[in-house]
Amino acid sequence: MKIGMVSLGCPKNLVDSEVMLGIIKDKQLDITNDPADAELIIVNTCGFIESAKEESISTILQMAQYKEEGSCKYLIMTGCLGQRYADELFESMPEVDAIVGTDSFTDIGWVIDQVLAGKRVKHLQKLESKNVQAPPRMLTTPDYMAYLKIAEGCDNCCSYCIIPQLRGPYTSRPYDEVMAEARSLAAHGVKELIVVAQDTTRYGEDLTGKLLLPQLLRDLNELEGIKWIRVMYLYPNNFTDDLIAAFAECDKVCKYIDIPLQHASDRLLESMNRYDTRAQVEELLAKLRERIPGITIRTTFIVGFPGETDEDFAELMDFVEKQRFENAGVFQYSQEEGTVAGAMENQIEPEVKENRYHELMALQAGISEEIHQEREDEELDVIVEGFDEENPALAVGRSYHEAPDIDGNIFIENAAELEVGQMVRVRILQGFTYEMVAELV
């Protein structure tokens, strides 16, 4: 039996896919990267916003074609979309043989057995019975990097977000379990450890009543073999002085702050059920830049949130222009059923959202280009991720300033002798909006 896996959505979902692949491997089943060759296909879906739902449905229908044209006999849906719409999808998509919820994916071995026995399965567990899974994992990332998921669920309850309903309340993984997995990843040659959760700053609060991320970073910093520790999804309301100190003092912790801010208008922040005002965020950002030399700050913003006026948007533009973030992602608000914001009456017209999106993106593009040009002649350590298809002597890599998949790349000239996963010292020659060009030092 050959099994194929298609993983959609965020890195946290990818970790779930890797856990499922590890379970499948333990069952002595073959795993293939080619869906056309698979007899059973698992699609780990995303259901966060409308575009993600559309991609998930499209992928499932595409995989279902292999039942007619390929080797596929069975199709299993896992992840957030299945959790959110299990009843409707089970009825409307007969080509799907099983739907598995976000809290029951570790039962994938049992689900496969049921499907192979000819049963059609809808397997959902109550989210309160959280199963925050330890290894085994079968890594699908390059050998030199891996994600380390430290918690599941979310307690922030932002008014636009469906995640707490899909993933349940915030549940930290046991500290010793997280460290054991990190040591295992280091022993397998991982150089870049990327710490993820829906909210990494809240880690440990439900275990001990204390925020444990600062101590976790200090302990991870002692692991042999690990070169970079990158932390994603840091929320501003739990960014303590101790956490700032951990970033500043731990040499392996990347001076890279991924902190979703979403807006700068106090009125909209309150409507979003965010915990901070613009003034509080500005105070935190000033403290971060003062105490962490060489810091890069990445953030995300939502435009077109219900009730966003021209004045609100102008305030956001002013905030971004003054803060000069190194990297920022911009999203058009997606009206999601089941959320507080989705039921608000003052929804923004799509054309207005689109215009504001392009205006903010253009502003940020100019800022990013200026920052990249300011880095010309600077020396950086870069991890090699591959080579340009048209010019094999041009290596492609990242420094601590860039997270995989979401930030830009650094192109290294005359680098044909380098190897993927190698860390090298480079000098920046030219900076552009999303990329930089460098030479070996």
Map each language-model feature to its residues.
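Proteins enriched for Cys/Gly/acidic motifs involved in redox and nucleic-acid/cofactor modification
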Residues: 1-203, 242, 257, 279-290, ...
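Terminal RNA-binding accessory module
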Residues: 343-441
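Conserved SAM/AdoMet-binding glycine-rich loop
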Residues: 75-79, 84, 89, 187-311, ...
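Active-site proximal loops enriched in glycine and acidic residues that flank catalytic Cys/His/Asp
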Residues: 197, 233, 261-263, 299-303, ...
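Short, hinge-like loop/turn segments at secondary-structure boundaries
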Residues: 93-94, 115-118, 211-213, 247-248, ...
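Radical SAM enzyme [4Fe-4S]-AdoMet core and its adjacent flexible, acidic
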Residues: 10, 204-225, 271-272, 335-366
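Conserved, mostly hydrophobic/aromatic
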Residues: 178, 195, 231, 259, ...
